[in-house]
Amino acid sequence: MDAFDAIPDPVVIDILNRVGDVKTLIRCRSVSKRFNSLATQSESLLLQLDQILGATESDSEIDSPIASFFRSLFKSIHGLLPPIFSKPANSDEILTRSPKTPAQILSGFERIRNLEVELYGGDVKLEKGAAVKWKAEFGKTLKSCVIVAFRSATVNTSAATEAAAVVDGVVESDSEFVCGLKTRVVWTISALMAASTRHYLMRDLVKDHKEMEKLIVRDSDGEGTVVMDAAGMKEYRETEVRGDNKESERVGERTVVPSVRMSMRHAPSLMLKSGICLEAATLVVVRPTGVASDDNDVELVTEAFAGDGDDCMYGEAVTALLKRRRNVLEMNSF
């Protein structure tokens, strides 16, 4: 027995949890029988689908220092392993023949608690210069979705603070709200369709891994995020077991979006204190029709964006937009 074999299993599992990256853990499994057993017990995973589905080692990828260390270590000791381990240790072959769905890729992992899935890129197609950022929560169907969008962003540092104060105090007229409404509705529908598509993509994964407590599905562009907590996933599984498709029916390759109420706030031109001017800035809070908590927009929006230190522009924008007049619209299921 060497020094590495003397390390207790819980310590090794804790190290593997810190690695997290599924691609690296698949390589861990190919090192030895012990690693093959322990790697599948990792509880916190990051699945980057662009890496698993056809990406090569030369593709650009961002690894943590721990993941890089493990990759170097395993490449070094791979040649020293006895023949009994040599054949299954070809991780490139494992990745090449990996199935294409998240559920199949993760079928060998037994104790997933927290899973983050990163998709290749965003889903919403916009005109040049426009941007949409959204966060949606799902159970058996959509629970809520917060969307912030704008047509363009420019930097103007002159008198930014004064301009921002003036814009925040403006009361939008009905004619100003109607102007550009079609575009804002299209942004909203596009975000909801993207969210429901991601929810549908995770259906088998949620059903198979009953031990999961949190699921996050995001994209590498930072456009949108789908979140499911333990209660939401349990609700989804129970609906599937009962065969109750009324609320969780599918259309094409996505979950049906239920009838919703949209709280929409808009500013034709929003000057932020940071000096950034957003044209056609829009904030939309979407909830299924009939949901009682229709007035806690501030809490929902703050949780989605305002506390995000990496996206201070969006946090500042939603804080300013929350001061604008709220217009309520309804939309049928689609």
From Swiss-Prot:
Keywords (A to Z) from UniProt: Nucleus, Ubl conjugation pathway
Start and end residues of each F-box domain: 1-49
Induction: Induced by auxin.
Chief location of this protein within or outside the cell: nucleus
Known pathway: Protein modification; protein ubiquitination
Gene3D superfamilies (alphabetical): 1.20.1280.50
Subcellular location: Nucleus
A GO CC term assigned to this protein in UniProt: nucleus
Biological processes per GO annotation: acropetal auxin transport; basipetal auxin transport; cytokinin-activated signaling pathway; protein ubiquitination
Quaternary organization: Part of a SCF (ASK-cullin-F-box) protein ligase complex. Interacts with SKP1A/ASK1, SKP1B/ASK2, ASK11 and ASK13.
Record's comment describing the protein's domains: The F-box is necessary for the interaction with ASK proteins.
Function of the protein: Component of SCF(ASK-cullin-F-box) E3 ubiquitin ligase complexes, which may mediate the ubiquitination and subsequent proteasomal degradation of target proteins. Involved in the control of basipetal and acropetal auxin transport by promoting the distribution and expression of the auxin transporter PIN2. Promotes cytokinin-mediated cell expansion in the root elongation and differentiation zone, without affecting root cell division.
Protein name, entry field: F-box protein AUF1
Native source species: Arabidopsis thaliana
